[in-house]
Amino acid sequence: METEVIEVNCPTCGKIVIWGEQSPYRPFCCKRCQLIDLGEWADEEKRISSNGELSDSDEWSEEDPLQH
């Protein structure tokens, strides 16, 4: 039984990375690329889009809404 080798591109540099135990930083090719990506998120160069912004007047809760 042959195991299919899955290859992905490093999101930072584009280098091909084998998706497996031999690639501990997957999907990144190395620790450096992983840290570059983390820095971009920390500097808010990357963000997850939303429908709108929460303001201080918006009501929200960290509680599970199903428990009310």
UniProtKB/Swiss-Prot annotation:
Sequence ranges of Acidic residues compositional bias: 55-68
A Pfam short name: YacG
Alphabetical keyword list: Metal-binding, Zinc
Annotated residues for binding of Zn(2+): 10, 13, 29, 33
GO MF entry, a single one: DNA topoisomerase type II (double strand cut, ATP-hydrolyzing) inhibitor activity
Cofactor note: Binds 1 zinc ion.
Region (Disordered) location: 47-68
Gene3D superfamilies: Erythroid Transcription Factor GATA-1, subunit A
GO biological process: one example: regulation of DNA-templated transcription
InterPro entries: DNA_gyrase_inhibitor_YacG (IPR005584), Znf_NHR/GATA (IPR013088)
Cofactor(s) annotated in UniProt: Zn(2+)
Family as reported in the entry's similarity comment: Belongs to the DNA gyrase inhibitor YacG family.
Function recorded in the entry: Inhibits all the catalytic activities of DNA gyrase by preventing its interaction with DNA. Acts by binding directly to the C-terminal domain of GyrB, which probably disrupts DNA binding by the gyrase.
NCBIfam families according to UniProt: PRK00418.1 (NF001638)
Subunit description: Interacts with GyrB.
Protein name: DNA gyrase inhibitor YacG
Biological source species: Yersinia enterocolitica serotype O:8 / biotype 1B (strain NCTC 13174 / 8081)
Lineage: Bacteria, Pseudomonadati, Pseudomonadota, Gammaproteobacteria, Enterobacterales
